[in-house]
Swiss-Prot record:
Gene Ontology molecular function: [protein-PII] uridylyltransferase activity; phosphoric diester hydrolase activity
Name by which UniProt lists this protein: Bifunctional uridylyltransferase/uridylyl-removing enzyme
Catalytic activity, as annotated: [protein-PII]-L-tyrosine + UTP = [protein-PII]-uridylyl-L-tyrosine + diphosphate; [protein-PII]-uridylyl-L-tyrosine + H2O = [protein-PII]-L-tyrosine + UMP + H(+)
Activity regulation comment: Uridylyltransferase (UTase) activity is inhibited by glutamine, while glutamine activates uridylyl-removing (UR) activity.
InterPro entries: ACT-like_dom_sf (IPR045865), ACT_dom (IPR002912), HD/PDEase_dom (IPR003607), HD_domain (IPR006674), NT_sf (IPR043519), PII_UdlTrfase/GS_AdlTrfase (IPR013546), Polymerase_NTP_transf_dom (IPR002934), UTase/UR (IPR010043)
BP GO terms, sorted: regulation of nitrogen utilization
EC number(s) given by UniProt: 2.7.7.59, 3.1.4.-
Cofactor requirements of the protein: Mg(2+)
Transmembrane segments: none
Length: 931
């Protein structure tokens, strides 16, 4: 146990009267003498009731004082007393031995997390029963009595029963056992047995094995991070096992305890691992993370370790966070969480660096932790940097005052490390972090500092260097607007990372685009080679700044453009380029929205987009930025379909901007797409290919990616050979976490609504849809639904159910409203979110159709309800464009009235808006006549 914290735990004794409870147990023993089972049950009930009372008191104190570590200590102290009381009941009343033999000895020991002296409300209890070499039945009986008492109380108990010899033997060969014994505390019984274990463990296991232990623990840490998600900035973090969580702090202390033989966290100061400021950070991080974890357990009544969206707001309220303009209470809480996770990562890096200097572990593992370590111990000046030296292939300071003498060195050190491919010496990093407050207005306006920063941003490995600048606080101090979004989380299900992490990842993706070679990024890579050379810095700074104004009350695109207009002149951009950067930031969501939510075969869509982008060069830059932005949102967000939509929008717009000239005109692009299909799909004869190609309209060839075209061809052939009216093909996209249903059937005015209703009735949530009609009147619709099951077989069965429902509705055997109503009660996962319903009815987006854009909180059955409501309003849906962005649905419908005309009457437009907003706001299924 970390003895530095035990004083607070003792206060828990005010809530738990051990002496009184001991008397109560004695009274129960007298009352139930000769009835052991009745006595055991009575003791369990008594202790369970006492535990419930003190746990309630601990929760009340936590809500008042918000000290998580104290709460964990109180809970651990209470659990210790419970175990001591159960041991006493077993040895005094059940298996009393007045004159115990050598074999009738036992030490009850806390191990693992419980042995640390800290315990969350629903944590497992790990116990080790140490028995003598020569054992009797007594030891097994006592251990069983204790365990059954705890299990009857509903506690989760892990246990092992071993002799000292067995413990030492297992600790030598099993790192988990070794770590458990490292974190032991004596609870009850024979102290001499415990002392023997501790002494022998120290001399026979620990001595001489520090390098082995550290290597194993860091390997475990890497694997744990891989399982939990590598980034510490994932927006639903695991408080216990995630990167920057409690387990990282524990690993840090285990290593220090093993290597430096410390027993209390304050000893980390004495052995030089941390200075006073770092030790305070260690304690502050632990207290905050324990507050979060204890509140999670109390709020859920289970060992919940993941801060999922549906819990984040409740925990924020429990911890006392309030909303501020531009930031919700939950976003302020999560920003604090991610800043804490960052601090934990910094502390781990400091310890690993100290171990490296002392050569306490092998170089290969260390190399993964500290990056790019190579042999050699020579000290020499860094080229072009007299204030810095190369120390074992790491950049270090030539003198302790290099930053004070010349604050530009705070930027220069990162550029020199980047230019010379050097890692950072831990002493240099520490000094940089402590010197960041030297970055003042004068340094921010310094031309040399700004030139160096732009070199960092536009040179190789920019993401890594910027990340290191961010971790030390230099980036946020040098660009103050960036400092405001560090560790900022957006409370939605679309963005996977914090804002700063997203921006840094986008820079890495931009460099991938520039390098080329990735087929998914082919268009952006092609355009990157063709932009004007002077615009290369423009696209880099735009990518870094495009979300810089998140968390402000106003639209972040407009506010971000203002930030760029203030910032970019100091970075060396002229007025024209500054305005271009501001325009790109202001429009950075436009291309994605048009590509995914508009009919790209509608001439008006292209003309409107051309009016926004104004020139081919600006469209090139916007395409590159849009690609990096979508790809940087998180795994599975970017896909071939979105890439194809952007490509189509780009090449459809190019001739409008050039007065008819396009590097690749529309007819040529259709021909190229068809030729690509012919070359890749060699299963059919030339006449068969010609007939199949003629079945699809031009929009199909421009919008659908090659993999889906091939899949569609095989599916249509198999469908027609099978002779069924309705055919469904099922595909699985693991990267996106969706199941794709491709439906081939005779076109039907209600088909989209029927498909949407069938998905809703099966509990399937539609995340996007691609809807096409063939030249011979068949519908070919691909619907992506959120994956519900881990096994493809289970997903396949759900898809089959959806197909059966569609068939039954088309045949008139089933009414959809009845089955949809039963399933559309709402998704628990979406309940924490609030999305304001919004409906736009617009005649400027198309010359042939009225466009209805609907956005609101996604829910099961929403698309069905919308299509049914639109049909009930006597409107025909010509095309639909379905997309979800986490919890937000944005569905766009191109409609006409029943005579094929646009909706021009203001009163009718207003009625459409009212009906759809009412549907979005109230969550009720619209009545309609399907089925």
């Amino acid at each position: 146990m970390d003895l530095a914290t035990t004083n607070d735990a003792a206060g828990a004794g005010n809530d738990f009267d051990t002496a009184r409870i001991t008397g109560d147990i004695d009274a129960l023993a007298a009352k139930h003498a000769g009835h052991e089972d009745v006595f055991r049950a009575a003791v369990s009930r008594l202790l369970k009731a006492e535990l419930a009372k003190v746990r309630d008191a601990a929760q009340a104190k936590l809500l008042r004082d918000r000290h998580g570590r104290r709460c964990a200590e109180r809970l651990c102290f209470i659990q210790d007393e419970i175990i001591r009381l159960s041991f006493s009941a077993a040895t005094r009343h059940l298996y009393h031995s007045p004159i115990p033999s050598d074999g009738e000895r036992m030490a009850v020991v806390a191990t693992g997390g419980y042995g640390r002296g800290l315990m969350a409300p629903e944590s497992d209890i790990d116990l080790l029963f140490i028995l003598p070499y020569k054992q009797t039945a007594w030891g097994e009986q006592v251990a069983e009595a204790i365990l059954y008492c705890l299990w009857d109380m509903g506690l989760n108990v892990g246990h092992a029963t071993r002799s000292v010899n067995e413990s030492i033997r297992q600790a030598r060969r099993d790192m988990t056992v070794r770590t458990g014994i490292l974190e032991t505390r004596f609870l009850a019984g024979d102290r001499a047995l415990y002392d023997e274990l501790v002494t022998r463990f120290d001399t026979e296991v620990v001595q001489g094995t520090a390098a082995e232990f550290v290597t194993a623990k860091l390997a475990e840490r890497e694997e744990r991070h891989r399982r939990a998600g590598q980034s510490r900035y994932l927006v639903e973090p695991n408080v216990k096992d995630g990167k920057g969580g409690l387990r990282d702090l524990h690993t840090l202390f285990w290593i220090a305890k093993y290597v430096y033989r410390v027993h209390e966290s304050r000893e980390l100061l004495g052995c030089g691992v941390f200075d006073v400021r770092e030790y305070r950070t260690f304690r502050r991080c632990a207290d905050f993370l324990w507050s979060v974890r204890c509140n999670l357990h109390f709020a859920t009544g289970r060992a919940e370790e993941r801060l999922s969206f549906d819990l984040q707001r409740e925990i924020a309220v429990r911890l006392g966070y309030t909303s501020h303009p531009g930031m919700q209470d939950v976003e302020r809480f999560m920003k604090h969480y991610f800043l804490t996770a960052k601090d934990v990562g910094d502390l781990t890096a400091i310890l690993c660096a100290k171990l490296e200097d002392q050569q306490a572990k092998p170089a290969p593992v260390l190399g993964r932790m500290m990056s790019r370590r190579r042999p050699g111990t020579e000290l020499r000046r860094v080229p072009e940097g007299d204030d810095f030296i190369i120390d074992n292939n790491r950049i270090n300071l030539a003198a302790p005052d290099v930053f004070k003498r010349d604050p530009v060195n705070l930027i220069r050190v990162f550029r020199l490390a980047q230019k010379n491919n050097l890692a950072f010496h831990p002493d240099a990093l520490r000094t940089v972090t402590r010197s960041r407050r030297l970055i003042n207005a004068q340094l921010r306006e310094n031309p040399e500092a700004n030139r160096l920063f732009m070199e960092i941003l536009t040179s190789n490995d920019a993401e890594t260097v910027l990340r290191r600048m961010n971790e030390t606080g230099v980036l946020g101090h040098f660009i103050r607007a960036f400092g405001k979004i560090v560790s900022m989380m957006q409370f939605n299900m679309y963005h996977h990372y914090t804002v700063d992490e997203h921006l840094l990842r986008c820079i890495g993706i931009l460099q991938d685009i520039e390098r080329g070679g990735n087929d998914e990024l082919a268009l952006a890579s092609e355009l990157m080679r063709k932009i004007h050379p002077e615009h290369r810095p423009v696209i880099y700074i735009t990518t870094l700044l495009h979300d810089i104004a998140k968390g402000r009350p106003e639209d972040h695109s407009i506010a971000g453009a203002r930030v760029a207009r203030r910032l970019c002149p100091r970075l060396g951009f002229n007025a024209s380029d500054t305005e271009l950067i501001a325009w790109l930031i202001e429009q950075h969501l436009t291309m994605s929205k048009v590509a995914q939510s508009r009919d790209l075969s509608d001439r008006k869509t292209i003309e409107n987009f051309a009016a926004v982008v104004q020139s081919v060069e600006q469209m090139k830059l916007l395409t590159i930025l849009t690609t990096a932005d979508i790809r940087g949102v998180g795994p599975g967000v970017w896909n071939g379909w979105k890439a194809q939509l952007l490509r189509t929008l780009y090449y459809e717009t190019e001739p409008v901007l050039t007065g008819g000239f396009s590097e690749v005109n529309r007819v040529q692009r259709i021909a190229e797409a068809q030729a690509e299909f012919r070359a890749a799909f060699t299963e059919w004869s030339e006449p068969e290919l010609n007939a199949y190609i003629a079945r699809h309209y031009p929009a199909y060839w421009l919008k659908v990616d090659l993999a889906h075209k091939i899949r569609h061809a095989r599916f249509l052939r198999a469908s027609e050979q099978g002779g069924r009216k309705l055919n469904i093909n099922v595909g699985f996209d693991e990267a996106r976490g969706v199941t794709e249903l491709t439906i081939f059937a005779a076109d039907h005015p209600w088909l989209l609504s029927i498909i949407a209703g069938a998905c809703a009735s099966a509990g399937a949530n539609i995340v996007d849809a691609q809807i096409y009609t063939t030249t011979d009147g068949q519908a070919l619709d691909t619907i992506a639904i959120s994956r519900e099951y881990d096994r493809d077989e289970d997903e396949g069965r759900r898809a089959a159910r959806i197909g059966e429902i569609i068939e039954q509705v088309i045949d008139g055997r089933l009414r959809l409203p009845d089955v949809v109503a039963r399933r559309a009660a709402g998704k628990t996962r979406l309940r924490p979110f609030v999305v304001e319903p919004k409906v736009i009815v617009n005649n400027q987006w198309s010359d042939r159709h009225t466009v209805i854009e609907v956005s609101g909180l996604d829910r099961p059955g929403l698309l069905f309800q919308l299509t049914a409501a639109i049909s009930k309003l006597n409107l025909n849906i010509a095309s639909a464009h379905v997309a979800t962005f986490g919890e937000r649905a944005r569905d766009v419908f191109y409609v006409t009235d029943l005579l094929g005309a646009r909706i021009t009457a203001p009163t009718r437009q207003a009625a459409i808006k009212r009906a759809l907003i009412h549907l979005l706001a109230n969550g009720g299924a619209a009545e309609q006549s399907v089925g």
